[in-house]
């Protein structure tokens, strides 16, 4: 995200626990090397704990708290003195509700600084004189649906630039909050990650047709930033095919296997980084952290068992999980497997390419990447799955 919209006086407000402080800390670190943090309601030690959890550089922060001090004019004067003495690049004021809600005080705070400022408040800060003066106004909120938490940052006003969207989803994770932008299926990286074609073999005519249609493909595979969905059956052959695809990608690039249930484990016959992330964990930001840990520096994320996410948490949650990965790692290619369900149009816009594979047949249901051959027979010979173009 372009942080130039935060180059003036920004006010972030919302209910407690929605992630205001975490977002302010992350943005502040991106705006300057030296950060002055003024806290009106939390002790310095608690702010330090948050900085450590977010894995930010604590040496860049000078933290002052003014807990239980009732002389507000004296506090304002002290903040001004600290600002002059510290000479920071950016200031964070956490707890602007502490100050009198009048134009005179708001003007004093607004005019005190000539560098980027991020002020944090709770309601009714969004209707205060300071909100009127602010260059950037963000309302943060959260809601729960089917047991899953959703955080939002809504840009209500921006004088110094165009925000990326009117509203962004947000996840508070180690390493700093991730602003989750909608995935753009046309925004792909230049590098292709091919199947090794040792376990999954496409017939020569299919490979040649694909190479002619897409010069960036020497053979079937994934582009950086792309997403492919495979809808397969639930039988042993289906699990073996999914494992074959996984292992072929693992031979071409670092690949991480993340699964919501252990069904596929016994079918994986190659050395690949793997991790179980239960569906219930994906209802909150801790589960998204687990995804980050599981993916690490892999080039391909192989997600198995996503039908369970749809059944238990809903399509909305699946979209957030996928968009989180794309926002955190725009270069990450995703191969997503759904077992025992039919491809649904509700899911199509989450993927560049959608396959249906079952009972010896494979069909490209959707392709934004130019698959010229859409139907295949699938035959298993000598330990490999062969995809042979078919008119049936």
Q: Which functions belong to the PLM regions below?
A:
Residues 4-33, 202-262:
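Glycine-rich P-loop/Walker A and Walker A-like loops and their local beta1-loop-alpha1 context
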Residues 9-11, 34-36, 89-92, 116-118, ...:
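Residue-level preference for the first positions of well-ordered beta-strands
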Residues 33-101, 256-315:
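Conserved inter-motif catalytic segment of the P-loop NTP-binding fold
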Residues 36-39, 117-122, 255-261, 278-279, ...:
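Short, hydrophobic beta-strand segments that form beta-sheet elements in well-ordered domains
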Residues 79-137, 293-353:
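P-loop NTPase motor core
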Residues 121-174, 337-392:
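Phosphate-binding/switch region of NTP-binding enzymes
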Residues 159-205:
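Charged, amphipathic alpha-helical linker segments immediately N-terminal to NTP-binding catalytic cores
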Residues 223-225, 231, 235-248, 252-254, ...:
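Long, charge-rich C-terminal accessory regions
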């Amino acid at each position: 995200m372009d942080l130039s919209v935060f180059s003036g006086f920004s006010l972030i407000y919302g209910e407690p626990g929605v992630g205001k402080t975490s977002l302010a800390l992350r943005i502040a670190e991106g705006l300057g090397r030296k950060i002055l943090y003024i806290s009106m309601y939390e002790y310095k030690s608690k702010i330090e704990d948050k900085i450590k959890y977010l894995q930010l550089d604590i040496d860049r922060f000078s933290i002052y708290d003014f807990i239980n001090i009732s002389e507000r004019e004296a506090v304002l004067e002290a903040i001004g003195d600290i600002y002059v003495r510290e000479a920071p690049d950016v200031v964070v004021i956490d707890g602007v509700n502490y100050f009198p809600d009048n134009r005179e005080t708001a003007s004093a705070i607004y005019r005190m600084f000539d560098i980027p400022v991020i002020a944090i408040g709770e309601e009714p800060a969004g209707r205060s004189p300071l909100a009127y003066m602010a260059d950037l106004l963000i309302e943060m909120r959260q809601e729960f649906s089917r047991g899953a938490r959703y955080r939002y940052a809504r840009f209500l006003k921006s004088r110094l630039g165009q925000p990326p969207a009117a509203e962004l989803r947000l996840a508070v994770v180690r390493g700093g909050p991730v602003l989750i932008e909608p995935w753009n299926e046309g925004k792909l990286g230049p590098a292709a990650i091919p199947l090794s074609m040792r376990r999954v073999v496409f017939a020569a005519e299919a490979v040649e047709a694909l190479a002619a249609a897409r010069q960036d493909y020497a053979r079937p595979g994934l582009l950086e930033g792309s997403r492919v969905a495979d809808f397969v059956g639930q039988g042993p052959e289906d699990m073996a095919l999914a494992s074959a695809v996984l292992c072929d990608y693992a031979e071409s690039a670092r690949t991480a296997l993340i699964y919501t249930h252990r069904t596929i484990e016994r079918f994986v016959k190659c050395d690949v980084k793997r991790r179980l992330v239960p569906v219930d964990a994906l209802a909150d930001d801790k589960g998204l952290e687990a995804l980050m840990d599981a993916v690490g520096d892999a080039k391909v994320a192989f997600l198995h068992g996503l039908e369970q996410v749809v059944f238990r948490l809903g399509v909305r949650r699946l979209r957030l999980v996928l968009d989180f990965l794309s926002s955190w790692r725009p270069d990450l290619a995703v191969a997503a497997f759904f077992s025992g369900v039919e491809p649904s149009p509700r899911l199509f816009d989450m993927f560049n390419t959608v396959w249906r594979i079952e009972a010896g047949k494979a069909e490209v249901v959707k392709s934004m990447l130019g698959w010229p051959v859409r139907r295949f027979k699938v035959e298993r010979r000598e330990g490999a799955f062969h995809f042979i173009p078919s008119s049936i």
